[in-house]
């Protein structure tokens, strides 16, 4: 299945400034889904939660547990909104391309935003930048910069390289898992459309892979949030 992303090249007349319309559209859809879901889940709150309120409270406690596993709650509670936003956004982004793919005139429109390395690396870069921001804000510039030459100044180049490797691994791990899943799903869809025998031959593997992809999508959203809090704790906690 040879499909390309709908890309607008050289926007505003700037060479190399390209815009992937599929990523833009799917990111907007994912954000809209997350926003509507969270508003729906937080309306008419009751002392005895039921239905979607139960799930929302479980999600809050789940993310809170991730934070407390990496830093004390007094320091980490300000990261609860960040963790919730990330886990919902990444989960929906991972799963939205599982059900189907949308192709219009050989352009791939409907897909998981996290199946694009540009999107995941941009997200990981933003997260690493946030860790530096909160490290300076909560510890002070002088104390924060000292961490790069601790315990000895020789550690400075290694810690600089570590920042780049953390950014790459955080983004590429998410991209690789979701992209591989969508590629295999696309191959199965292609097999199913070749003939009636191909349809029955691919139907069961396709259903099994879609189920497995839901599991992978959930695991990867957890891993991303967990690593975010690990990196954050390294910057804001004095015991790291």
UniProtKB/Swiss-Prot annotation:
<keyword id="KW-1003">Cell membrane</keyword>
<feature type="transmembrane region" description="Helical">
    <location>
        <begin position="116"/>
        <end position="136"/>
    </location>
</feature>
<keyword id="KW-0472">Membrane</keyword>
<dbReference type="Pfam" id="PF00119">
    <property type="entry name" value="ATP-synt_A"/>
</dbReference>
<keyword id="KW-1133">Transmembrane helix</keyword>
<dbReference type="GO" id="GO:0045259">
    <property type="term" value="C:proton-transporting ATP synthase complex"/>
</dbReference>
<feature type="transmembrane region" description="Helical">
    <location>
        <begin position="21"/>
        <end position="41"/>
    </location>
</feature>
<keyword id="KW-0812">Transmembrane</keyword>
<keyword id="KW-0138">CF(0)</keyword>
<comment type="function">
    <text>Key component of the proton channel; it plays a direct role in the translocation of protons across the membrane.</text>
</comment>
<keyword id="KW-0066">ATP synthesis</keyword>
<feature type="transmembrane region" description="Helical">
    <location>
        <begin position="183"/>
        <end position="203"/>
    </location>
</feature>
<keyword id="KW-0406">Ion transport</keyword>
<dbReference type="InterPro" id="IPR045082">
    <property type="entry name" value="ATP_syn_F0_a_bact/chloroplast"/>
</dbReference>
<protein>
    <recommendedName>
        <fullName>ATP synthase subunit a</fullName>
    </recommendedName>
</protein>
<dbReference type="InterPro" id="IPR023011">
    <property type="entry name" value="ATP_synth_F0_asu_AS"/>
</dbReference>
<keyword id="KW-0813">Transport</keyword>
<comment type="subunit">
    <text>F-type ATPases have 2 components, CF(1) - the catalytic core - and CF(0) - the membrane proton channel. CF(1) has five subunits: alpha(3), beta(3), gamma(1), delta(1), epsilon(1). CF(0) has three main subunits: a(1), b(2) and c(9-12). The alpha and beta chains form an alternating ring which encloses part of the gamma chain. CF(1) is attached to CF(0) by a central stalk formed by the gamma and epsilon chains, while a peripheral stalk is formed by the delta and b chains.</text>
</comment>
<dbReference type="InterPro" id="IPR035908">
    <property type="entry name" value="F0_ATP_A_sf"/>
</dbReference>
<dbReference type="GO" id="GO:0046933">
    <property type="term" value="F:proton-transporting ATP synthase activity, rotational mechanism"/>
</dbReference>
<dbReference type="GO" id="GO:0005886">
    <property type="term" value="C:plasma membrane"/>
</dbReference>
<feature type="transmembrane region" description="Helical">
    <location>
        <begin position="212"/>
        <end position="232"/>
    </location>
</feature>
<keyword id="KW-0375">Hydrogen ion transport</keyword>
<feature type="transmembrane region" description="Helical">
    <location>
        <begin position="78"/>
        <end position="98"/>
    </location>
</feature>
<dbReference type="GO" id="GO:0042777">
    <property type="term" value="P:proton motive force-driven plasma membrane ATP synthesis"/>
</dbReference>
<comment type="similarity">
    <text>Belongs to the ATPase A chain family.</text>
</comment>
<dbReference type="InterPro" id="IPR000568">
    <property type="entry name" value="ATP_synth_F0_asu"/>
</dbReference>
């Amino acid at each position: 299945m040879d499909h390309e992303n709908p890309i607008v090249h050289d926007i505003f007349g700037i060479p190399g400034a390209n815009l992937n319309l599929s990523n833009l559209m799917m990111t907007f859809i994912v954000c809209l889904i997350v926003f509507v879901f969270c508003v729906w889940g937080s309306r008419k709150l009751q002392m005895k939660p039921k239905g979607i309120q139960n799930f929302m409270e479980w999600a809050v406690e789940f993310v809170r547990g991730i934070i407390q596993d990496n830093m004390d709650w007094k320091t980490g509670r300000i990261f609860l909104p960040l963790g919730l936003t990330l886990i919902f956004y990444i989960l929906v982004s991972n799963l939205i391309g599982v059900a189907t793919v949308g192709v219009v005139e050989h352009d791939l429109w409907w897909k998981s935003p996290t199946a694009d390395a540009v999107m995941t690396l941009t997200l990981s870069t933003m997260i690493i930048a946030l860790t530096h921001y909160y490290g300076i804000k909560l510890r002070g510039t002088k104390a924060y910069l000292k961490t790069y030459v601790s315990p000895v100044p020789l550690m400075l180049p290694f810690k600089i390289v570590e920042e780049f490797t953390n950014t790459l691994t955080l983004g590429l791990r998410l991209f690789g898992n979701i992209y591989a899943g969508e590629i295999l799903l696309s191959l199965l869809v292609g097999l199913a459309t070749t003939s009636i025998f191909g349809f029955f031959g691919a139907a069961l593997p396709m259903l099994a892979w879609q189920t497995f992809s839901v599991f992978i999508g959930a695991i990867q959203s957890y891993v991303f949030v967990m690593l975010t809090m690990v990196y954050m704790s390294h910057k804001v906690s004095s015991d790291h």
